[in-house]
């Protein structure tokens, strides 16, 4: 028999579960005025996110809906054949080609700001309006990977009156090309918060005139690799008497792992940390080029 399975899901709940509250100190919390826990949305009033592609350094925009897309194309083949003499042959095979995505919209620090701190909201006409009050910083982490998996098992067995022997082969293969792209931004603390705009500082580096800053400086990752495992096994199941049974076997495995990531070291052998604008091909302050290894 052959089975084809297609899946297409968009899981937004992880991006919408954050909420501000006041911690009382005795283990309980109070609601912030105007924000109902469990009933108010703390997701900013924008439907798109901007990010820097870790692989190319390109600036891209994607909707929150598309950023949570996970799709799978899976083919399964199952076969079993029996001979009259007790011999049986099984084949089980599965191939999966998938796109996996996971989107965080993680609240970070919350601070109270005054007008002198230079935060503004933007009106529908594009005009900036000075803002003071609580400011919530947030990290958007867009995780996405292309995955290919292959599983294959074939087994030949024969059953006698008091014993059964089996010989089989397992083959497992997994290939992944994964990256996480992170973007920082600030917003007001209220239901359906507004994005906040501010000037660059020594620690904050915006992308143009947008509210997004410090692209790929926090938690950005890249990994591309594969794993292959091949095994040969044999077993013998023997009922010596009605009370005694012996079951033994042997298994021989070959495993190979290979991959590259962005654990980059400079000429002195020290690790190079993330920085604003981090991506494959970027150059760190000490001149180290960011490249998979």
Name each model-derived stretch.
Residues 72, 96-110, 182-188, 192, ...:
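C-terminal/domain-terminus segments
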Residues 30, 59-61, 71, 80, ...:
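Context-gated lysine
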Residues 2-5, 147-149, 159, 164-174, ...:
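Structural signature of Gram-negative outer-membrane beta-barrels, strongest in the C-terminal barrel
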Residues 3-76, 101-142, 196-218:
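Acidic/polar loop-and-plug regions of large Gram-negative outer-membrane beta-barrel proteins
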Residues 1-21, 67-103, 141-182, 292-293:
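Transmembrane beta-barrel strand/turn architecture of Gram-negative outer membrane proteins
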Residues 2, 40, 49, 79, ...:
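Intrinsically disordered, low-complexity segments enriched in small/polar residues
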Residues 53, 83, 123, 266, ...:
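Acidic surface patches and DE-rich sequence motifs
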Residues 28, 47, 91-94, 238-241:
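Intrinsic disorder/low-complexity detector
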């Amino acid at each position: 028999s052959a089975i084809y399975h297609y899946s297409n899901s968009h899981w937004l709940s992880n991006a919408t579960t954050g909420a501000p509250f006041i911690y009382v100190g005795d283990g309980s919390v109070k609601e912030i005025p105007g924000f109902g826990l469990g009933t108010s949305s703390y997701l900013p009033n924008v439907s798109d996110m901007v990010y820097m592609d870790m692989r190319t350094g390109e600036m891209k925009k994607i909707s929150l809906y598309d950023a949570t897309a996970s799709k799978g194309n899976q083919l399964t083949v199952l076969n079993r054949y029996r001979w009259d003499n007790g011999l049986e042959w099984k084949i089980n095979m599965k191939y999966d080609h998938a796109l996996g995505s996971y989107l965080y919209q993680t609240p970070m620090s919350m601070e109270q700001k005054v007008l002198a701190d230079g935060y503004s909201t933007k009106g529908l006409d594009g005009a900036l309006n000075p803002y003071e009050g609580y400011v919530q910083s947030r990290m958007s982490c867009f995780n996405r990977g292309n995955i290919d998996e292959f599983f294959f098992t074939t087994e030949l067995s024969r059953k006698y009156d008091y014993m059964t022997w089996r010989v089989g082969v397992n083959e497992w293969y997994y290939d992944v090309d994964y990256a996480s792209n992170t973007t920082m931004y600030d917003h007001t603390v209220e239901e359906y918060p507004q994005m906040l705009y501010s000037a660059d500082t020594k620690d904050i580096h915006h992308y143009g005139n947008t509210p997004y800053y410090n692209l790929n400086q926090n938690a950005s990752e890249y990994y591309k690799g594969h794993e292959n495992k091949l095994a040969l096994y044999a077993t013998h199941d023997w009922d010596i008497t009605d009370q005694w049974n012996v079951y033994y076997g042997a298994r021989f495995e070959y495993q190979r792992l290979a991959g590259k990531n962005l654990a980059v070291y400079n000429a002195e052998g020290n690790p190079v940390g993330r920085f604003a604008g981090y991506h494959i091909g970027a150059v760190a302050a000490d001149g180290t080029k960011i490249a998979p290894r």
